[in-house]
Amino acid sequence: IGKNKYYMSKKSYARIENKTTTVSGHKYWFGKTGKVITSKWKYKNGSRRYYFDKKGRMLTNTSKKIGKYVYFFNKNGVLQRNLISYKGYNWVLSHPLKIGVNRTKNTITIYAAGSDGKYNIPVKAMICTVGSASRPTDKGTFSTGYIYRWKDLGGRTEYQDNGDVVYGQYVTHFYGAMYFHSVCYTVNGNNHTLLTGAYNWLGNSGSHGCVRLKCSDAKIIYNLAARQRCKVVVYDSNYAGPFGKPKLKKIPSWQNYDPTDTNA
């Protein structure tokens, strides 16, 4: 009808409305009025994302530049928000990498540079804790440096103020006394001494300048920095990034280990 596309059920001859349907090998999304939706994202269950191109076809098993960024979709059309697991470390490391630290949103997004040299391929988003207002994580452009499997991070945190030393796993230096690292532990090398309150505070500001992460995310940065000097950009923005801000599943107060730590 005009420029709008509709589809009639072969069984009932009724117009398909408010659902996705496969037509001639392609999936299309028909809106509430039955009109095919074009050039638009579709969200499902609050997490899965799909994209329908200008012809209304769901993107599957491909990559495509949409707006500023290049996105990857699997065979089922689901947007891939972890290219390390989808494409592998070697593929990711074949590109120059940038770690964007958004202080406003307490969110990190890792980007890979495309053939044009622009960091426009989002690789993974991570929830984090940046420095507090009194001891902020410095803004600016830096790069990853030394890495440490475990490291003494000094004394005092907002969850342990007796001055005792705390420690971090998968520690990556990027500027001055600032590091990416796991949430803190009270015993060096013992991953069952986690400061649970600090873990549950991820997504909010409050560190002494370092950037705290879930163990699995700190490990990713550690592994990348072991093989490439990654660019680090610390900035402020109300835009969480192309993958948004990841949600944190909090742990009970008695749990003394990071649930993302495969060695715990």
Say what each PLM segment does.
Residues 7, 106-111, 232-234:
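Short polybasic amphipathic segments
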Residues 45-46, 104, 226:
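Short strand-connecting beta-turns/loops that link adjacent beta-strands
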Residues 11-12, 21, 33-34, 54-56, ...:
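A short, sequence-level motif marking secondary-structure junctions
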Residues 5, 27, 49, 70, ...:
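A residue-level signal for beta-strand positions that form part of recognition/binding surfaces
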Residues 1-95, 163-164:
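Extracellular adhesion/carbohydrate-binding repeat motifs centered on closely spaced tryptophans
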Residues 86-194:
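Gly/Pro-biased beta-strand-loop elements
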